[in-house]
């Protein structure tokens, strides 16, 4: 390696070290500032989430697709959602993010529930291109709008607990809508396995919520335990912050 290349290489390593050090210093400063304010109560999502999702609807898919490919979440969606079959209910469906992951030959009906109007509009437009004509497609703004006495073979929810004010009540509703041999498939994010990471999530939870309508540090395991669901499996990824759950 020539002198010039060595100089560039060493300079690059030095610059990267300075950058990482600056980021670490900023994180530490923000965490300590947050903890010095003694905010012991974790943020709980509220109805403002809907207005936030309406505001970010147009950029939502573009933004999360890049992040999910990088973090591996894209592939978690692929391997979990291919198990959906029969009459499928997806709650918090957003702009139709999960359409590419469904095995349509296994699906008879697809019912979406999405409270954000802008997200519903995008999903309806995508459904015309993505959902096969032999699959009955419907969309509602609220679970209470579902046809009476309706039940489902598969209930899907991906990254929704973070924006649900009454998450346990919502999970319990799914059990009442599930057929006796049905499955509930969830991908969620929340509190991680490591204290240092959770301190960072806590410090930035409020600003992240204001931008994305998402409380990213909720205790997912505790919420599941408080619900009436029977958990068949719960696998965690990304330092424990991403949860892949199968339940009934």
UniProtKB/Swiss-Prot annotation:
Which is an annotated GO molecular function term of this record?
Answer: mRNA m(6)A methyltransferase activity
Membrane-crossing residues? 7-25
List the CDD domains.
Answer: AdoMet_MTases
* Disulfide bridge map: none
User: What Pfam family is a match for this entry?
Assistant: Methyltransf_23
* Any one of the GO BP annotations: methylation
Q: Where in the cell is it found?
A: Mitochondrion inner membrane
What is this protein's function? Probable methyltransferase.
Q: How does it sit in the membrane?
A: Single-pass membrane protein
Keywords recorded for this protein, A-Z: Membrane, Methyltransferase, Mitochondrion, Mitochondrion inner membrane, Transferase, Transmembrane, Transmembrane helix
| Coarse class of the protein's main subcellular location | mitochondrion
EC primary class: transferase
This entry's Enzyme Commission designation comes to 2.1.1.-
Q: Record's family?
A: Belongs to the methyltransferase superfamily. METL family.
Q: Which organism is it from?
A: Schizosaccharomyces pombe (strain 972 / ATCC 24843) (Fission yeast)
Can you say what this protein is called?
Uncharacterized methyltransferase C3B9.04, mitochondrial
Q: One GO CC annotation, please?
A: mitochondrial inner membrane
The opening ranks of the lineage are: Eukaryota, Fungi, Dikarya, Ascomycota, Taphrinomycotina
């Amino acid at each position: 390696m020539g002198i010039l290349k060595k100089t560039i290489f060493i300079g690059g390593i030095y610059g990267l070290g300075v950058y990482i050090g600056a980021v670490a210093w900023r994180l530490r400063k923000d965490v300590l500032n947050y903890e010095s304010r003694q905010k012991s109560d974790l943020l709980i999502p509220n109805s403002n989430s809907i207005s936030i999702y309406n505001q970010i609807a147009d950029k939502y898919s573009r933004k999360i697709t890049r992040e999910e490919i990088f973090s591996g979440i894209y592939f978690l969606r692929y391997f979990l959602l291919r198990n959906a079959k029969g009459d499928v209910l997806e709650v918090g469906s957003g702009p139709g993010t999960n359409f590419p992951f469904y095995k349509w030959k296994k699906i008879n009906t697809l019912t979406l529930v999405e409270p954000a109007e802008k997200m519903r509009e995008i999903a309806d437009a995508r459904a015309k291109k993505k959902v096969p004509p032999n699959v009955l497609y419907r969309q509602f703004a609220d679970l209470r709008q579902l046809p009476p006495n309706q039940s489902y073979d598969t209930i899907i929810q991906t990254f929704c607990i973070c924006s649900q004010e009454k998450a346990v009540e919502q999970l319990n509703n799914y059990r009442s809508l599930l057929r006796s041999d049905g499955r509930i498939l969830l991908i969620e994010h929340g509190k991680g396995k490591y204290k240092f990471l959770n301190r960072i999530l806590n410090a930035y939870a409020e600003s992240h919520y204001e931008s994305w309508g998402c409380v990213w540090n909720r205790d997912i395991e505790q919420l599941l335990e408080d619900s009436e669901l029977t958990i068949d499996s719960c696998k965690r990824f990304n330092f424990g912050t991403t949860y892949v759950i199968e339940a009934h």
